[in-house]
């Protein structure tokens, strides 16, 4: 089925790489107009050149509320509406209970949690005025189980999951659904920012490290397959489409059974 987002307008943060890039490409293929939000202007221009008039790039750092507000305003002004918000931007964090810095804490909270809160804050009025909208937040299995992510990362993502449910309760009466996706082991370069061990694994050998990551992630799931960005993009497509209209306040876990498999399987990843 093609055209599941025909006539819809989406804003996707972190849209120039990994899950975000895959989602932009899928949404465009399904008929959407997309505002790509990200910091990498060169990559943004490349994507606009490749995808044409269906997309527009807006350079922004989602850790700052004024920049998110400007992106939402740009989407509404350019396309005349905003049907879908995918708060996808994120990154890995390091540090444990006793060895994180104030800067690391601020960065984790502002990037992983604050960006989603600001996105919802500024998109919600536009969607409420329309009487419809779909907000999707990118959370993580690290919000559900221990040993699935770093200390600060896991805490921030748990906040994203809870904020999703609270926002869905508040906005549902206005025709706006709010859901989150909790990816399991998805093979993207962003993985290597999640721990010192993982970063060392990738240093200077990203292509080989990605191949190794995919093999190791496959071992952590019952179906023996690594997740790829397009798997999360497909979940976002369902939630954003009319087919997902009855889903609200839901945490859509896309992990091939990783959380069921448990700690020992995941610890083999890196």
Segments predicted by a language model, with ranges:
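Conserved glycine-rich cofactor-binding loop
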Residues: 16-17, 40
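C-terminal substrate-recognition "lid" of short-chain dehydrogenase/reductases
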Residues: 79, 117, 132, 223-254, ...
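Substrate-binding pocket helix/loop in short-chain dehydrogenase/reductase
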Residues: 96-97, 104-109, 135, 217
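Active-site helix of classical SDR
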Residues: 120, 156, 164
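Alpha-helical segment proximal to the catalytic Tyr-Lys
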Residues: 125, 169-170, 245
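Residue(s) in the substrate-gating loop at a strand-loop-helix junction
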Residues: 140
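Short, small/polar-rich loop/turn modules that mediate ligand/substrate recognition or access, typified
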Residues: 172, 177, 247-249
């Amino acid at each position: 089925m093609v055209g599941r987002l025909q006539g819809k307008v989406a804003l996707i943060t972190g849209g120039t790489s990994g899950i975000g890039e895959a989602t932009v490409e899928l949404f465009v293929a399904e008929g959407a107009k997309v505002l790509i939000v990200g910091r990498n202007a060169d990559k943004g221009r490349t994507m606009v050149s490749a995808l044409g008039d269906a997309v527009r790039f807006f350079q922004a750092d989602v850790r700052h509320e004024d920049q998110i507000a400007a992106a939402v305003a740009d989407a509404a002004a350019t396309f005349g509406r905003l049907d879908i918000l995918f708060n996808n931007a994120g990154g890995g964090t390091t540090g444990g209970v006793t060895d994180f810095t104030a800067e690391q804490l601020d960065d984790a909270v502002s990037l992983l949690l604050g960006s989603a809160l600001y996105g919802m804050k500024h998109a919600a009025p536009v969607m409420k005025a329309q009487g419809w909208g779909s907000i999707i937040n990118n959370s993580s299995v690290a919000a559900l189980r221990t040993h699935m992510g770093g200390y600060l990362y896991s805490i921030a993502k748990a906040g994203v999951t809870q904020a999703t449910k609270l926002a869905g309760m508040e906005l549902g009466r206005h025709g706006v659904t709010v859901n989150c996706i909790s990816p399991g082991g998805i093979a993207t370069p962003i993985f290597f920012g999640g721990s010192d061990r993982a970063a060392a694994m990738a240093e200077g050998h990203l292509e080989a490290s990605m191949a190794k990551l995919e093999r190791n992630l496959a071992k952590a799931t019952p179906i023996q397959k690594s997740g790829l960005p397009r798997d999360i993009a497909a979940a976002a497509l369902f939630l954003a489409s009319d087919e997902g209209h009855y889903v609200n306040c839901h945490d859509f876990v896309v992990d091939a059974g990783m959380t069921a498999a448990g700690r020992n399987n995941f610890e083999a990843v890196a």
